[in-house]
Amino acid sequence: MVNAITSGDILSAEQIKRHSKVYAGPGAGKTYFLVENVKNIIMTNETVAKSRARKVLCITYTNAAVDEIRRRLEKYVDYVEAYTIHGFIIEHIIKPFQEELINIIKSDFDISVSKKGMISSQIEGLGILHGIDKEEIYNFIKSTNPGQFDSDAFNYSKKIMGEVEVDNDLFLKSKIAGEELIHKIKASSKIKEDHVIPLKQYVWSVVRKLTHNEILYFGYRILENNPTALYALRVKFPFIFVDEFQDTNPLQTLLVKLIGQKSTQIMVVGDIAQSIYSFQGAKPSDLND
């Protein structure tokens, strides 16, 4: 059973034992609801109050919103963590489970990546190949893919290098709903375009960065593939609040639902009439599901 409440409510002791959906329009105090309910859980729920190893997780969709939540909950810093969805995945899934990430890159894309060095996220606002000499890329590709990447392919790839951070459109489309998205990714990952796969090998092996779409994809795949990773998150975060849920794209929704299948209670807060990230494939209707 799922609670369906308004942003004026404080969740009762019984309600926090179930997943909750909070409907609130613009200016209805969604952040206030989130902050006050986090405080209530910290002060009244023994699972969190008596163990600083177990925390309330807040996920929202802008760095400014993260800063605001952290500011309002500053006194409770030992009991709560706040991130954007990408920040959460990097910190709690990608970084701790690097070996699993490398194995999934191999199994899903048939690309071998060395275990030397941390694979993390690109710097916000910069292309993933920002500041890297194209000849360095060419020499790497020639050495690792002899005979598979000729000069014509390289000349073509140079035209798209400025777009490598979004070349996931070739096999990481996020405009497809639910499980269909995962099947689409897995199916099209078998494509071996000479100008894409070697570049991806360079980015993942040498630059060691993931694009925003890749963070979502690999975060989900690690949890799907590694019960230990999933269990660790459920133990650490018995309560998760997701703000602006109407802006959640299908892969983000799948990830949150996966965590919430056992133990962890999910509270989603949103307004189905207002989606500022619809270009990412966000489905406001997920708030009703």
Which positions does each model-derived feature cover?
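Conserved helicase/translocase P-loop NTPase motor core
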Residues: 2-5, 194-241, 249-255
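Catalytic P-loop NTPase motifs of RecA-like helicase/translocase cores
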Residues: 41, 89, 245-256, 275-277
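Conserved RecA-like helicase ATPase core segment
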Residues: 255-289
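Coupling/switch/interface segments within P-loop NTPase motor domains and analogous charged loops
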Residues: 103-204
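Inter-Walker segment of RecA-like/P-loop motor cores
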Residues: 60, 76-96, 191-220
